[in-house]
Structure formats: structure tokens, C-alpha cells
């Protein structure tokens, strides 16, 4: 007891107790703040899921089912991930305006907040590809134009044409132009495979290679279109072929007419 009393009277006891008290209060505050932030985030996510569910029931369930299980006219959305919803709804392809062979890009029906709520709701049903963030989509930093052009010609040009202008497919379907598409939506299309497009997993195209493809597309958008008419970015070759074909055809026609007249 006497020793404890002497320790209490020690000149360092006061500062040590003060430091200990501050550390205790700071630690308690940090723990409480972390718990509060987690609770707030969970509450916000729950609210988004509920909002997305109501939007889904109102605008999507008639085709995809009340529980997104799919049906006769629409596939299941369980496991497609937030990226698929963000692409389809964020580009106006969904909801479809008619039951055609392929969903066309059109004006977006929902606000960005509603699109995100729908994506969060569908993502809550089962794991799937996530919406890429700004850090991941830094194609200017992590992409290569030369590599992207080579990858595009190898993997994409057979459908989207070598200049990314799109092209016709079978059974009334088509590959849309990739010009003017947001980088986020290009990345989402690569990882989700919308419509007739295959899925390019990270084993097929790494995230860095996907960024290179995006960088090449964005570079191609800024390139001047040569020739009198912008026919698919082919340049003057198309116009020259057209003039040559018409010119030769007219000359042949004139030659035949003159020969017939001479008889």
C-alpha cells in the first residue's frame, strides 16, 4: 500500500494517467465511429436494395419474374451482377421497347440513382460482375493504344468491323458501333457479354488488356474521317469503288448502246 501511495505521488503519475485516459477515449471513439459508419452503410445499402426491388417489381418483373428468376420471354437475372444491370439499363437497352431480336440503345428511362438502385438489388440476389470504379477505369494511365488496336482487331473486328462501326450478324441481329460509348459501359460489356456478345473473362482479356481496348476505341473516336463521305471510317476507298463501279457500268452501257445503234 505504501509503495502504491508513493507511485501515485510520483511526478510522472499525472502525465501518464492523462496519456492513458486520452488513449482510452480515442480508442473508444474510433471503435464507436467505425460501428456507426458500418451501421450507416448497411442502412443505406438496405434502403437502396428496397428501392431497387420496388423499381424492379414495377418495371422489370413482368418479363423477368417477381424474383428475377426469368421466364419464357426473358432470362434469369440471378448472378448477372450489378455490371450487367448498369450496362443494360444505363444505356437504355432495358426496358425493351418491343420484343425484337435485339435490345436497341435508346434514351435512358431511369435516373442514375435509380439505375444504381436496380443494380444493387440484382447484385444482392447472387454474386456477379461489379460495376467498375474510376480507379479501375484509368485507361489513360494503364492502357496501350498499340496493344488495344491489336486486341480489338483480333477479338472484336469480326463483328464490330475493324473501325468499330458495327456490322450485321445472323438472324436479324447486329453488332452496334462502339464509338461514343462510355468507358464504363465498354468495360461492362466485355465482362458481361450482352446480347450476342461473348464474355471476355480476365483469363481471356486481363483488366489491363481491356483498358487497352478502351484506350484504342477512345483514340479512334478522335481520328479524322478521311474522304468526302464518312462511310464507316473506311475513307476514300469506298467512294472510289462506288465511282469506279458506276463509271465502268455507264461506259459499258454506252458501248453496248453504240454497238446496237451501229447495227
Language model region names:
Residues 11-34, 107-133, 201-263:
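C-terminal capping alpha-helices of c-type cytochrome domains
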Residues 33-47:
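Ser/Thr/Pro/Gly-rich low-complexity linker/stalk segments immediately outside membranes or between
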Residues 2, 141, 245-249:
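N-terminal soluble segments of membrane proteins
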Residues 1-7:
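N-terminal secretory signal peptides that target proteins for export/translocation
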Residues 78-126, 172-225:
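Extracytoplasmic electron-transfer domains, predominantly the class I c-type cytochrome c fold
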Residues 45-49, 53-79, 87, 91-97, ...:
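Periplasmic/extracellular electron-transfer cofactor-ligation site
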Residues 32, 50-57, 82, 149, ...:
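Sequence context surrounding c-type heme c attachment/ligation sites in exported
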Residues 139-146:
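Ferredoxin-like iron-sulfur electron-transfer modules
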Amino acid at each position: 500500500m505504501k509503495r502504491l501511495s508513493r507511485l501515485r505521488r510520483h511526478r510522472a503519475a499525472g502525465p501518464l494517467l492523462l496519456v492513458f485516459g486520452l488513449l482510452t477515449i480515442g480508442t473508444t471513439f474510433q471503435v464507436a465511429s467505425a460501428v456507426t459508419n458500418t451501421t450507416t452503410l448497411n442502412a443505406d445499402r438496405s434502403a437502396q436494395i428496397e428501392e431497387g426491388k420496388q423499381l424492379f417489381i414495377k418495371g422489370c418483373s413482368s418479363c423477368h419474374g417477381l424474383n428475377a428468376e426469368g421466364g419464357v420471354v426473358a432470362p434469369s437475372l440471378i448472378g448477372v451482377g450489378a455490371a450487367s444491370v448498369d450496362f443494360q439499363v444505363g444505356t437504355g437497352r432495358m426496358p425493351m421497347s418491343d420484343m425484337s431480336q435485339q435490345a436497341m440503345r435508346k434514351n435512358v428511362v431511369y435516373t442514375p440513382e435509380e439505375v444504381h438502385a436496380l443494380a444493387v438489388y440484382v447484385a444482392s440476389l447472387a454474386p456477379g460482375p461489379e460495376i467498375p470504379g474510376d480507379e479501375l477505369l484509368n485507361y489513360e494511365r494503364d492502357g496501350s493504344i498499340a496493344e488495344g488496336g491489336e486486341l480489338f482487331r483480333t477479338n472484336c473486328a469480326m463483328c464490330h468491323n475493324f473501325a468499330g462501326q458495327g456490322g450485321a450478324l445472323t438472324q436479324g441481329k447486329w453488332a452496334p458501333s462502339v464509338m461514343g460509348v462510355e468507358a464504363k459501359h465498354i468495360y461492362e460489356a466485355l465482362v458481361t457479354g450482352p446480347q450476342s456478345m461473348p464474355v471476355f473473362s480476365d483469363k481471356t482479356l486481363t483488366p489491363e488488356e481491356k483498358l487497352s481496348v478502351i484506350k484504342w476505341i477512345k483514340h479512334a473516336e478522335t481520328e479524322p474521317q478521311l474522304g468526302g463521305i464518312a462511310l464507316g471510317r473506311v475513307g476514300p476507298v469506298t467512294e472510289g469503288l462506288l465511282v469506279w463501279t458506276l463509271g465502268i457500268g455507264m461506259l459499258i452501257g454506252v458501248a453496248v448502246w453504240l454497238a446496237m445503234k451501229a447495227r
